[in-house]
Amino acid sequence: MKKNIALFAGSFDPFTRGHADIVERSLAIFDEVIIAIGINEQKRTLFSAERRQEQIARYYASRPAIGVITYSGLTVDLVRQTGATALVRGIRSGSDFEYERTLADLNRHLSGVDTVLLCTDTRLSFISSSAVRELISFGRDVSDFLPEGFVLD
């Protein structure tokens, strides 16, 4: 029997409680979730793709249904390479929905893959990786915005 595999792609710089919430809720729908860390050489990141992969893989080490990979190129090509059955995306607001809907339509046109949009838990909707990066740049404690037990190193 073919497994239902979700591909959850993003920069995850850093991985937040909101991301972890989407992963957990995806597992209620899919057999496996692949967290795919996109590499974009033009984008300045706080952590290298390798470090992000190590951090997230360490956090989910005891969870065999969750994989962590890095990739470059188009996400729709990665869908084919991994055998994923759908993309999963989290949305925090109406503006996120508009952006994600357009992207979902494009991905479906290019590859036929469906996108499952999950609304972020309202208690987490204010959390974004960019806000966490900014807090880190000011030396602030960001542990409230990261999954419990998640280590940034």
UniProtKB/Swiss-Prot annotation:
GO MF terms, alphabetically ordered: ATP binding; pantetheine-phosphate adenylyltransferase activity
NCBIfam families noted in UniProt: coaD_prev_kdtB (TIGR01510), cyt_tran_rel (TIGR00125)
Similarity comment: family membership: Belongs to the bacterial CoaD family.
Pathway stated in the Swiss-Prot or TrEMBL entry: Cofactor biosynthesis; coenzyme A biosynthesis; CoA from (R)-pantothenate: step 4/5
InterPro entries: Cyt_trans-like, PPAT, Rossmann-like_a/b/a_fold
Cross-referenced Gene3D superfamilies: HUPs
Reaction equations catalysed: (R)-4'-phosphopantetheine + ATP + H(+) = 3'-dephospho-CoA + diphosphate
A GO cellular component annotation in the UniProt record: cytoplasm
Protein's UniProt name: Phosphopantetheine adenylyltransferase
Top EC class of this enzyme: transferase
Compartment annotation: Cytoplasm
The organism's taxonomic lineage, starting at the top: Bacteria, Pseudomonadati, Bacteroidota, Bacteroidia, Bacteroidales
Binding residues for substrate: S11, K43, T75, R89
Annotated binding of ATP, by residue: S11, F12, H19, G90, I91, R92, E100, L124, S125, F126, I127, S128, S129, S130
Pfam families, per the entry: CTP_transf_like
Keyword Signal found: no
Coiled coil: none
GO biological process: coenzyme A biosynthetic process
Keyword Nucleotidyltransferase carried by entry: yes
EC assignment: 2.7.7.3
